Amino acid sequence: NKSRKRRNRLSFLGAATVEPPKPIPLTWKTEKPVWVNQWPLPKQKLEALHLLANEQLEKGHIEPSFSPWNSPVFVIQKKSGKWRMLTDLRAVNAVIQPMGPLQPGLPSPAMIPKDWPLIIIDLKDCFFTIPLAEQDCEKFAFTIPAINNKEPATRFQWKVLPQGMLNSPTICQTFVGRALQPVREKFSDCYIIHYIDDILCAAETRDKLIDCYTFLQAEVANAGLAIASDKIQTSTPFHYLGMQIENRKIKQQKIEIRKDTLKTLNDFQKLLGDINWIRPTLGIPTYAMSNLFSILRGDSDLNSKRILTPEATKEIKLVEEKIQSAQINRIDPLAPLQLLIFATAHSPTGIIIQNTDLVEWSFLPHSTVKTFTLYLDQIATLIGQTRLRIIKLCGNDPDKIVVPLTKEQVRQAFINSGAWQIGLANFVGIIDNHYPKTKIFQFLKLTTWILPKITRREPLENALTVFTDGSSNGKAAYTGPKERVIKTPYQSAQRAELVAVITVLQDFDQPINIISDSAYVVQATRDVETALIKYSMDDQLNQLFNLLQQTVRKRNFPFYITHIRAHTNLPGPLTKANEQADLLVSSALIKAQELHALTHVNAAGLKNKFDVTWKQAKDIVQHCTQCQILHLPTQEAGVNPRGLCPNALWQMDVTHVPSFGRLSYVHVTVDTYSHFIWATCQTGESTSHVKKHLLSCFAVMGVPEKIKTDNGPGYCSKAFQKFLSQWKISHTTGIPYNSQGQAIVERTNRTLKTQLVKQKEGGDSKECTTPQMQLNLALYTLNFLNIYRNQTTTSAEQHLTGKKNSPHEGKLIWWKDNKNKTWEIGKVITWGRGFACVSPGENQLPVWIPTRHLKFYNEPIGDAKKRASTEMVTPVTWMDNPIEIYVNDSVWVPGPIDDRCPAKPEEEGMMINISIGYRYPPICLGRAPGCLMPAVQNWLVEVPTVSPISRFTYHMVSGMSLRPRVNYLQDFSYQRSLKFRPKGKPCPKEIPKESKNTEVLVWEECVANSAVILQNNEFGTIIDWAPRGQFYHNCSGQTQSCPSAQVSPAVDSDLTESLDKHKHKKLQSFYPWEWGEKGISTPRPKIVSPVSGPEHPELWRLTVASHHIRIWSGNQTLETRDCKPFYTIDLNSSLTVPLQSCVKPPYMLVVGNIVIKPDSQTITCENCRLLTCIDSTFNWQHRILLVRAREGVWIPVSMDRPWEASPSVHILTEVLKGVLNRSKRFIFTLIAVIMGLIAVTATAAVAGVALHSSVQSVNFVNDWQKNSTRLWNSQSSIDQKLANQINDLRQTVIWMGDRLMSLEHRFQLQCDWNTSDFCITPQIYNESEHHWDMVRRHLQGREDNLTLDISKLKEQIFEASKAHLNLVPGTEAIAGVADGLANLNPVTWVKTIGSTTIINLILILVCLFCLLLVCRCTQQLRRDSDHRERAMMTMAVLSKRKGGNVGKSKRDQIVTVSV
């Protein structure tokens, strides 16, 4: 009765009314209808098609259609005699967006636990039970034609998934997978495999299996699917996915391989593909199928003929035997898996076992990517491949890996083999070399060549040393204890050298050290002993490599081989011995060197006269110090090489002029030095036409040294090469299908065609009737009449005389080395439009440089000569050490604290324009490419409570931090690519108790579980390992579906909305809320690509100050709703903390529209501000760039003292106000001071203008320098005549004291003329009291009162002068000022500040005239005031004595103003 009940339950298929499944819409690349005409069908097939269509119509699978889409339909007859209808959907599939595969491979039945009972079912007409989306049905219409079109065709469209549609398998898998999902959730301890429409269920007991199957039946029926009752399997043997499954064993189903159909490459390709598919079950090693794989070699045409060789027939027989006998085992879910690696012939073999039961085989491909693949590398590759397979099968790494290596060999492999390190990366199991004792693996054919036995990696002691060499003439030789020359059939120097090494290994039966000048041969010989040699289409190379491997393996004594550079002319016995080997294969080398030393003949002449290779000839010329400047320079990126003299380099091409008729093939040649053009019209472009054209060119232009052409057949033929060799002409070609290498002649083609059109359409010469006459007229115009840009002579004159005017020839220049990314100094050889040829220095080849990579070299002037060439301001990059950023809060934010920040940071800053370069990616914050974007980040303190309602009390901190580009990096491949995990303790799972105090947060330096990417683009990759927490639903233990997406309780990360607008957050869910990441840690971003730099834990303090930090407090409560627990989190903003972040000198913040250009590695910013601090008033529409000033330079950020528009007018006005009668001695001293002050204030005014608008550039300073001496000498004479008339300067003393505060800091306009076009003037901002303040207070309000305390005034002036300024006699001061102002040009300053200064200059002249009149009047007042004269004389004596004393000090010198 019990068994009858089970049978009844198994036969139950369900009869409940079900809802149709919801269709999945398709995505289309285009909505334009696709119509493919239906082809005619025979009457028999047409009748069958009508019957099948009516059948499908009755079942509701199709419906009548009037769709504008159409696909052909046809029928085929099965072996049973039934007909099957198929639709050709290739055209429709082409416009469907693919969904992608959901199951990229077959599931392995070996993972089914052993002895578990099984049930296997097949879904009936699965595709036809799944509906199409209504809007997609019309796309799958088809037409049933009528014979002779005697009636309208019948049209239908599919309502269900049609067979052959691109996404039908994916949609089918999705529908079936949805139907099985409740079964998987309810019976999670059962093992269910689903592939397309085949379903396998396994359970530990029979009863549980019946329960699972019954539930599965109902779910499948509810989903609208039907089970094929005749395909239910309930007893062994089971057949599933081509396998025969028993209680413990799994075998391949019996199949027969037909050999009579194996005739073409396509046939064998399909056969080997099928065999490879089942090899993991059969266990056929790669070496056992080598002959079958060899049949695939040769012609790649799929229809090319292939023959089944006897050896390959034996291997097919082996496959058939394995199909009959091979078996694998189902696993024990409680036992661990192991991986065994066997050192089989050809390549290693891997076996996955459990105890002694075989689970699966693993093999490497027969063909490799590299020419030589070391056996140890193959083992490592197989380990990595099989580890991934095991993880895919069961989700875990193997517990043990057994390898054919000793413990010491494994240790050495970890040290020396990169492939081994990759294959065993992150493996934590056991690595062993003891294989299990079983006979199932004994049939494997093992090899002993795993690690090198004969080849050594270090030189051998007390061994012979042999030098080898080979030549392209076929000679191979070695020298050492004896010499030998071998004649080989090879025309390759490397193959001849390979023969020399093989001969040495055969001739010397003892330990030897081999030295070769071929790096290729050295590397091949080192690796060949244990390597798998890749098959090559070159039979000669295959023979050589196989002979080399056999020779090495047959040796009884070890050898060592190394590489030496040839033709280096270095001293020492190794170089001499290698030259001796060279002489054995090329005795002409010495003669070529002697001839070049005598005549300096070029490389082409040496190659033609002597039997030397091109490399040897070029080496001789390049090592000659006399020839390097005349040798054709090497090519730089972006520049077409040009000749340095006439006929050094030609470019030649063929263009077409259709109007010439039969002679439309115009052959054009241009000399790249003079741009002289010659062209001939031919009837074709074959080699004979090219030679005819060149002979014409030789008659007109001469014979060139080198010609560059494209890869046309006329230029690449042997006849053309022979023709060039007869004329001793070198020939090169450009990159195929890329005309940029022929840019000069391509542009010449366009110029010539344009000239022909001009002369034909607008010329008056009617006598030029033939094509050659028209061509000659155009060439005469271009060569003898036209003068091109940047030239002063015609192309013909340049070609005949060899003289080319270059305005920059011989000048020093800065040129950029793109390889090293550095700027170097060189000398210009020639200069053209967009290019230049530069000589880097002695014994170096010239290089061609595009003009965008050139800068003029300017001799440093003034104090700049003594300074290093570094920019005034440099950006702080990710490779620099982290800087300190100070905050004004020590409770909520960690870091250095400084409360002395400016009270109003928004008022600081100067407007500047800046343009600087960088080497490594700069640190930039804001919305811009290359800048890190700020965003909101949350940190949480979680305090458990004892309340039955409230589960937790949360104290959360929200603030600005750095936005990740993506969320958590769960991608395994990327985690492996990081190759490191920062050192440091992981973030704690629970917050320390002391951090639960909401008044103080304990910030820790901890590492999160995974990194986030802050930036990943052309500027580099920036990552951060700081924890980033979010609330999420805890769905663990739930049986129903539960959303698991993380939800952020904080404000939106859009920075356009202020944090202050959010006061409350509420989160509700039927599931408890959990915090995703514990720990309170600051972000620590670092660059990992293209370079790896240090961490920068300080940057986030700049972002956190841009908005208030917010403190949230709240509880998570638990209540009951609908008989279910309901969780609510209420968070309220309880506190906001304003912050201010600052940097300190020499660091600054450049704020504005910063643009970073990675191609030129420059940073530009117009109208930016210089800041030291930011706070919540900062607008993130701007960007922040961290910069560092040059050492010893202070950049002004606060200058609340405005500059006068015209300092000279102000000085003279002050002088006129306080003209008094004074001693002439004291006047001279004050004159010197005034002149110095005029110069200083002029310099300061110009510096202020430069600081505000960045007007100063290199040209500006050069202009200034040229005219400075003449202008200032003239100005000095005028000022001196004026100064002789001044008697007293009472108010000027006060004004002088004010200016001395600035003068003591020695204004300097510090620029680097060769590396930067931007100047910033340093000025120290200091509000401390100055000594001259006392003098000012003593004299203020005394304009009309002459009763001064002269003694006290003298004492104050003396103390102030002694502390700040040394007054010396006037003549010395004038000379010192004139010398210090040698590089100051006020004319350029006048031009810069515009018409306002012109008016000021006019006012100065007027004031000077008025001053002369006043001075005349004051001379009359001297006789009326004797007591005043005596007072002034006293001051003069004081000044003289003071000046003399100070002048003796070597430390204190005259007033200098440096520019």
UniProtKB/Swiss-Prot annotation:
UniProt-listed InterPro entries: DNA/RNA_pol_sf, GP41-like, HERV-K_env, Integrase-like_N, Integrase_C_dom_sf_retrovir, Integrase_C_retrovir, Integrase_cat-core, Integrase_Zn-bd_dom_N
Segments crossing the lipid bilayer: none
Reverse transcriptase domain location: 57-245
Entry EC no(s): 2.7.7.49, 3.1.26.4
Positions of short motif LPQG: 161-164
Residues within the DNA-binding region(s): 811-859
Source organism superkingdom: Eukaryota
One annotated GO molecular function: RNA-directed DNA polymerase activity
Location of the RNase H type-1 domain: 460-590
Domains: entry comment: The LPQG and YXDD motifs are catalytically important and conserved among many retroviruses.
Free-text function comment from the UniProt entry: Early post-infection, the reverse transcriptase converts the viral RNA genome into double-stranded viral DNA. The RNase H domain of the reverse transcriptase performs two functions. It degrades the RNA template and specifically removes the RNA primer from the RNA/DNA hybrid. Following nuclear import, the integrase catalyzes the insertion of the linear, double-stranded viral DNA into the host cell chromosome. Endogenous Pol proteins may have kept, lost or modified their original function during evolution.
Family: Belongs to the beta type-B retroviral polymerase family. HERV class-II K(HML-2) pol subfamily.
Protein name: Endogenous retrovirus group K member 7 Pol protein
Organism of derivation: Homo sapiens
